[in-house]
């Protein structure tokens, strides 16, 4: 659906220095998926989303949407192509002098759409976003979440194939954010719309996205299914972003107890191992730890744990201290991996 190949974007910065906002980005986004792009401030994510509809023309590379090369189009062709790409923003950009209905109708009016046809398009959209009862209200009379719903309906008015969302929930409280994400998921499901969602919040990615690309300094440093990225983050930036949602670090009080335990093990010539386990799907429901303990005669001390949900799928993370013979611990970890558990040794003491 969307193909970005070799995308680089350079700007002339203060003092005449070159700013490399994007560096050789390759992305392929499938039709009908919700694709997340996440990164810290300055990572290049907002530049990237504006490259998709060529609001920013890349310094190099090609942009293809629905089989059409946007970078090869002239001004008129690009204007037509953009009608199939809707966009919502962090700031709602509503006209205060127009009602909810009229704000949604605005792009259709500008395109010269007949009045009756506008009505046929706008009223179902207002019902879809839950604002049919507020169509005659003005922006000052509705909440921030409702304003964003107006922005979403307006972006859908041209009946696009792609919806770009640039930090659309960043200015909203957590409860309103969840309701907007639920709405985007509903739109994706009912309209078959491809959604590209830009955010700096991993919680947003966790709730709604099918796949995610992690940007750092203008480069894609990690790419994959959201559940896989949470299970096996490879890049430090990804780990840090996930850590804001699901703590990957042991609390200080737990660390102090672990250090005492490891020191005692060293003094008696024992061997304790510290592991982080991540599991999902059936692994959450099955007693795999109990089986490992029984099968290999080990002691597992659960130090820290967290269970959450990603796209309706259970996800768990545990930090455990394993005590026993080295060979038995190795065999137990092999057994857990065979059950689909992701095993990472944090530290060990001989």
UniProtKB/Swiss-Prot annotation:
InterPro entries given in the database record: AAA+_ATPase, ABC_transporter-like_ATP-bd, ABC_transporter-like_CS, ACT-like_dom_sf, MetN_ABC, MetN_ABC_transporter-like, NIL_domain, P-loop_NTPase
Signal peptide annotation: none
Binding site for ATP: 39-46
One Pfam family it belongs to: NIL
Presence of the UniProt keyword Ligase in the record: no
Membrane disposition: Peripheral membrane protein
Key words, A-Z: Amino-acid transport, ATP-binding, Cell inner membrane, Cell membrane, Membrane, Nucleotide-binding, Translocase, Transport
Taxonomic superkingdom: Bacteria
PROSITE patterns for this protein: ABC_TRANSPORTER_1, ABC_TRANSPORTER_2, METN
Subunit and interaction comment: The complex is composed of two ATP-binding proteins (MetN), two transmembrane proteins (MetI) and a solute-binding protein (MetQ).
Name used for this protein in its record: Methionine import ATP-binding protein MetN
Organism (species): Ralstonia nicotianae (strain ATCC BAA-1114 / GMI1000)
Gene from which the chain derives: metN
């Amino acid at each position: 659906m969307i193909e970005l190949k070799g995308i680089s974007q350079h700007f002339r910065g203060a003092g005449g220095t070159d700013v490399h906002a994007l560096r050789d980005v390759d992305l392929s986004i499938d039709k009908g998926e919700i694709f997340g792009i996440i990164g810290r401030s300055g990572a290049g994510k907002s530049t990237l989303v504006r490259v998709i509809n060529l609001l920013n023309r890349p310094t190099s590379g090609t942009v293809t949407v629905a089989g059409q090369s946007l970078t090869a189009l002239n001004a008129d062709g690009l204007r037509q192509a953009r009608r199939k790409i809707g966009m919502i923003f962090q700031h709602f950009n509503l006209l205060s002098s127009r009602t909810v209905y009229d704000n949604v109708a605005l792009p259709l009016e500008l395109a010269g759409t007949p009045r009756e046809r506008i009505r046929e398009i706008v009223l179902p959209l207002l019902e879809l976003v839950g604002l049919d009862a507020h169509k005659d209200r003005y922006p000052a009379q509705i909440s921030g979440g409702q304003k964003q719903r107006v922005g979403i309906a307006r972006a859908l008015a041209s009946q696009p194939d792609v919806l770009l969302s640039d930090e659309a929930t960043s200015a909203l409280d957590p409860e309103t954010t969840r309701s907007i994400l639920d709405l985007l998921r509903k739109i994706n499901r009912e309209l078959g719309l491809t959604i590209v969602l830009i955010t700096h919040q991993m919680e947003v990615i966790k709730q709604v996205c099918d796949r995610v690309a992690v940007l750092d300094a203008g480069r894609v440093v990690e790419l994959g299914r959201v559940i896989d990225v949470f299970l096996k983050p490879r890049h430090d930036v990804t780990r840090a972003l996930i850590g804001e949602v699901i703590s990957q670090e042991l609390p200080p009080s737990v660390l102090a107890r672990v250090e005492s335990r490891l020191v005692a093990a060293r003094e008696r010539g024992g061997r304790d191992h510290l592991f982080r386990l991540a599991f999902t799907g059936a692994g959450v429901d099955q007693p795999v730890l109990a089986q490992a303990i029984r099968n290999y005669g080990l002691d597992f001390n659960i130090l820290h744990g967290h269970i959450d949900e990603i796209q309706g799928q259970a996800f768990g993370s545990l930090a455990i201290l394993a005590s026993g013979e080295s060979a038995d611990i190795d065999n137990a970890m092999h057994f857990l991996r065979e059950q689909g558990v992701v095993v990472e040794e944090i530290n060990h003491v001989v």
